[in-house]
């Protein structure tokens, strides 16, 4: 039974791959635009890797201050974190602005979309480094 199930899965996969249509001209153009927007707004190179060095050894070594909720914050680590995150978030916003029709959305909808996807985009970008 398991062998039949595996065979049917393979056959279905082959059928799906054979019947999948090629993207049309408009879809290829959209793919090109998104790819170009990504390339223009994605940070590359060793400078990003240099900035993140504080993560492994330095956390907990700087001055620690309590927050109003009673949590403790390492000011130096937080400062380094914001130095990295602020430009990363700015690049995600710039990426979104380069996407077709994004700027046509109402401002409130743009903000909702950016809040919902910002961390995912930054995670994907970090994963491919």
Swiss-Prot record:
UniProt source species: Sparus aurata
Keyword terms of this UniProt record: DNA-binding, Metal-binding, Nucleus, Receptor, Transcription, Transcription regulation, Zinc, Zinc-finger
Entry-linked SUPFAM superfamilies: Nuclear receptor ligand-binding domain
Positions contributing to 3,3',5-triiodo-L-thyronine binding: 91
Domain remark from Swiss-Prot or TrEMBL: Composed of three domains: a modulating N-terminal domain, a DNA-binding domain and a C-terminal ligand-binding domain.
PROSITE patterns: NR_LBD (PS51843)
Superkingdom of origin: Eukaryota
A GO BP entry: cell differentiation
Gene Ontology cellular-component annotations: RNA polymerase II transcription regulator complex
Protein location: Nucleus
Pfam families noted in UniProt: Hormone_recep
Gene name for this UniProt entry: thra1
Family of the protein in this entry: Belongs to the nuclear hormone receptor family. NR1 subfamily.
Protein name as annotated: Thyroid hormone receptor alpha
Keyword Metal-binding attached: yes
InterPro entries: NHR-like_dom_sf (IPR035500), Nucl_hrmn_rcpt_lig-bd (IPR000536), Nuclear_hormone_rcpt_NR1 (IPR050234), Nuclear_hrmn_rcpt (IPR001723), ThyrH_rcpt (IPR001728)
Function: Nuclear hormone receptor that can act as a repressor or activator of transcription. High affinity receptor for thyroid hormones, including triiodothyronine and thyroxine.
Domain NR LBD positions: 26-129
Molecular functions per Gene Ontology: nuclear receptor activity; RNA polymerase II cis-regulatory region sequence-specific DNA binding; thyroid hormone binding; zinc ion binding
């Amino acid at each position: 039974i398991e062998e039949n199930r595996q065979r049917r899965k393979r056959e279905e996969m082959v059928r799906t791959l054979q019947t999948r249509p090629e993207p049309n001209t408009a879809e290829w153009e959209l793919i090109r635009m998104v790819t170009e927007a990504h390339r223009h707004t994605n940070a590359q190179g060793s400078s990003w890797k240099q900035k993140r060095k504080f993560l492994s050894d330095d956390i907990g070594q700087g001055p620690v201050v309590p927050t109003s909720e009673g949590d403790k914050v390492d000011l130096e680590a937080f400062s380094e974190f914001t130095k990295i995150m602020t430009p990363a978030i700015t690049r995600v916003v710039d990426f979104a602005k380069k996407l077709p029709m994004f700027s046509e959305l109402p401002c409130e909808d743009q903000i909702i979309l950016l809040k919902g996807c910002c961390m995912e985009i930054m995670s994907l970008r970090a994963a491919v480094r």
